[in-house]
């Protein structure tokens, strides 16, 4: 059974993100780029002013391109998307707050992250992690190389 305030709780994340200036920063990761695609480090500001990192890979050629968005797993390390995907699609792999490359000032503990702050809705870590995921979606919606269809 869904709690009465369930929808309000999750809609609150979207409302909170409206007041965040994401200040995107892209920097090519030349060691990861190949003739078929360019890989960037993407930094964005998410909820509570937290800077998050994502791998952002764009195929070479004329776009726009469809996107494969690799949502973060329950672990400390996020890997760059597979080579074959990067050749044909824009690929994004988010490192949410606490994961490696997004671990300053907070480093997530495994196990333990799943229930961190669960006793109060505004301190539950997965509320902020959901915001991190939505921040990347907002970034993608504003990119010319992304096929939004």
Where are these regions (language model features)?
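Cap/lid segment of the alpha/beta-hydrolase catalytic domain
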Residues: 79, 83-84, 89-131
